[in-house]
Amino acid sequence: MGSSRLAMRSALGLFFLLFVQISLALKFDIAAGKGERCIRNFVLKDQLVVVTAIVSGERGDGQMVNMHIKDSMGNDHGRPKDVIGETRQAFTSAGDTTFDVCFENTLVSRRGISNPHRSIELDVDIGADARDWSNIQAQEKLKPIETDLRRIEEIVAEVVSEMEYLRAREQKLRDTNESTNERVKWFAFGTMGMLVGLGVWQVIYLRAYFRSKHLI
């Protein structure tokens, strides 16, 4: 009974991972001399990010791929130059922010290439996905099922944190919207009051003017 329940929990855990544990994995070509191409993602504060890129080609083919990882807070997280094969960059986010992984393929010489380009495989792991669970399992002497459950626990905690962040952001936007509506309402009342006051003043002025001319 206990073993079947454990197996069921393991199956549910793996099923959950299929839907929740989604890392960004892309494969694309980047032509030489066409400018920078960036992939954007979002990360919460203090989350580990591991960026793995596999770049095709070989040195001396007249192309040079440079990589740049930066976030919207102005932080640089790596600028590998002339990337060939697999390269990996890891960093921990300083805050809730978006970050860009950018590639630029520079043509340094033609060498008879008609359509110079490089193929790039990009894998971005964030949070629990970025941790080395094989190493954790070996160090803490965990069973596979315990490792899976630990991983699920961390992923669920990250999902909860992200939902809390979205809820707080929604509340902030709602408060800003309500504050703006309140200001617009009072501005409209003030404008109407000014128009009414201006109309009354015009009536009084015209009445006094016509009386001075003995027209009324």
Curated annotation (Swiss-Prot):
Annotated TM spans: 186-206
Biological process according to GO: endoplasmic reticulum to Golgi vesicle-mediated transport; Golgi organization; intracellular protein transport
Record's GO cellular component terms: COPII-coated ER to Golgi transport vesicle; endoplasmic reticulum; endoplasmic reticulum membrane; endoplasmic reticulum-Golgi intermediate compartment; Golgi apparatus; Golgi membrane
Keywords: Endoplasmic reticulum, ER-Golgi transport, Golgi apparatus, Membrane, Protein transport, Signal, Transmembrane, Transmembrane helix, Transport
SMART domains: EMP24_GP25L
Superkingdom, natural source: Eukaryota
Name of a matching Pfam family: EMP24_GP25L
Main localisation: endoplasmic reticulum
Membrane disposition: Single-pass type I membrane protein
Lumenal side: 26-185
Keyword hit for Transmembrane helix: yes
Cytoplasmic membrane side: 207-216
Cellular location(s): Endoplasmic reticulum membrane; Golgi apparatus membrane
Signal peptide: 1-25
Domain spans labelled GOLD: 36-126
UniProt family annotation: Belongs to the EMP24/GP25L family.
Function: Constituent of COPII-coated endoplasmic reticulum-derived transport vesicles. Required for efficient transport of a subset of secretory proteins to the Golgi. Facilitates retrograde transport from the Golgi to the endoplasmic reticulum.
The protein, known as: Endoplasmic reticulum vesicle protein 25
Organism: Emericella nidulans (strain FGSC A4 / ATCC 38163 / CBS 112.46 / NRRL 194 / M139)
Taxonomic lineage of the native organism: Eukaryota, Fungi, Dikarya, Ascomycota, Pezizomycotina
